[in-house]
């Protein structure tokens, strides 16, 4: 069996959970002896065997970003000839999978749903008119796909809600995973101090991109209520738009007028530095208003951190309230934005959960150890590779 994986992100160019998923899934599948996996990704040429990078087309340099994406996708299609299955990840690569399958090669197209355009209307802020194009690409590809892999039960429900014409039997759940050998507690006090954090003082830490869905503005407001000795550490980069970047910067400046120990690392750090920063923290916080699963929570749990996270999307399938962390309740406006119905209440509940986490170190450590056990036992990439292979075989009738 030959499977061609189509993705915007692939090492070394990874900036989100979808990229982590693709990299780890490819590694798990290539470890098997009964299949060949070829990767087609955006960007520069890769040295990795059976992996092809596809740069932006210079002829489309002045075009809308979504049109540029379509150009790269079309460049990918030619390389899929001879594949038994094409498997695309995110709308950025869905067009390539759809063209290869439905219009050219005839092989089955499988899509992994990491996020959905109808559930992220704020992307119009980033893509402009291209949001209508990305939404059309996603809808067209999903409705024609042989199977859709949802990364959580919550995502499966969202797929069927967003695209009700899809046969529910075609939508399978295969969770994201974690490499618990790589993601583990590894003290690095020099690294931590080098970023301006005192490893001997309590801290709450956020890791993620600066996007609407990650809920950073709510977190920055909630952190006003933390005890003064608690540091606030934000490993937050890759802003979607100048607008969200400016909003976060303004809230950060305001928070710094009320307390010391607010540390913002605006670039995406190497994994070894992230694990050192996680190891030094007291609790991890994920204030997302939209999160299909949240690999970042698994990464924190694997590093033995208790997690304070919003009870939305697939997060409750990872974080067990009262066992591995605290789930913060949220009632959301049903317009696709994930906006809290009562933002002040959400901020207050988030602050209360964070205060619980930092006020009882023994309980926090207990939750962290339980989180590590859960990550190891339930979310290994080997098992996720096996379950993905089952989906491949089902569409091939093997």
Language-model segments: which ranges?
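A conserved mid-protein helix/loop that constitutes part of the nucleotide-sugar donor-binding site
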Residues: 20, 202, 206-225, 246
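Glycosyltransferase donor-sugar binding loop
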Residues: 45, 178, 231-249, 263
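Short His-centered aromatic/hydrophobic patch
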Residues: 88-93, 113
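Nucleotide-sugar donor phosphate/pyrophosphate-binding loop at the beta->alpha transition
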Residues: 107-108, 118-140, 157
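Carbohydrate-associated surface elements
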Residues: 154, 177
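Nucleotide-activated donor-binding/catalytic signature segment of Leloir-type glycosyltransferases, i.e.
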Residues: 201, 245-268, 272
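Aromatic "clamp/platform" in nucleotide-sugar-dependent glycosyltransferases that forms part
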Residues: 289
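Short hydrophobic beta-strand element within catalytic cores of glycosyltransferases
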Residues: 306-309, 319, 326-327
């Amino acid at each position: 069996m030959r499977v061609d994986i189509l993705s915007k992100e692939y090492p070394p160019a990874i900036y989100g959970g979808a990229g982590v998923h693709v990299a780890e899934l490819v590694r798990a599948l290539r470890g098997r002896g009964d299949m060949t996996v070829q990767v087609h990704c955006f960007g520069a040429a890769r040295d990795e065997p059976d992996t092809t990078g596809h740069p932006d087309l210079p002829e489309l340099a002045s075009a809308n970003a979504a049109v540029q994406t379509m150009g790269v996708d079309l460049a990918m299609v030619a390389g899929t000839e001879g594949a038994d299955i094409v498997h695309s990840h995110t709308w950025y690569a869905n067009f390539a999978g759809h063209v290869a399958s439905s219009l050219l090669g005839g092989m089955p197209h499988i899509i992994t749903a990491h996020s959905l355009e109808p559930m992220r209307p704020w992307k119009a802020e980033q893509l402009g008119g291209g949001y209508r194009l990305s939404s059309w690409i996603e809808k067209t590809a999903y409705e024609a796909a042989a199977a859709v892999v949802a990364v959580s039960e919550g995502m499966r429900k969202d797929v069927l809600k967003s695209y009700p014409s899809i046969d529910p039997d075609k939508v399978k759940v295969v969770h994201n995973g974690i490499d618990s050998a790589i993601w583990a507690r590894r003290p690095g006090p020099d690294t931590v101090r080098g970023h301006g954090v005192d490893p001997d003082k309590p801290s709450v830490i956020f890791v993620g991109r600066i996007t609407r869905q990650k809920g950073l503005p709510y977190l920055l407001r909630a952190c006003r209520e933390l005890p003064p000795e608690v540091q606030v550490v934000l490993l937050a980069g890759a802003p979607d738009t100048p607008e969200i970047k400016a909003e976060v910067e303004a809230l950060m400046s305001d928070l710094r007028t009320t307390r010391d120990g607010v540390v913002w690392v605006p670039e995406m750090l190497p994994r070894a530095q992230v694990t050192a920063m996680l190891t030094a923290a007291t609790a991890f916080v994920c204030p997302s208003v939209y999160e299909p699963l949240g690999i970042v929570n698994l990464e924190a749990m694997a590093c033995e951190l208790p997690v304070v996270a919003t009870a939305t999307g697939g997060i409750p399938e990872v974080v067990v309230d009262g066992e591995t962390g605290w789930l913060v309740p949220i009632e959301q406006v049903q317009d696709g934005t994930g906006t809290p119905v009562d933002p002040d209440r959400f901020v207050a509940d988030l602050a209360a959960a964070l205060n619980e986490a930092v006020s009882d170190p023994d309980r926090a450590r207990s939750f962290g150890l339980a989180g590590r056990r859960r990550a190891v036992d339930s979310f290994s990439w080997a098992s996720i590779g096996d379950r993905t292979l089952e989906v491949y075989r089902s569409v091939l009738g093997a």
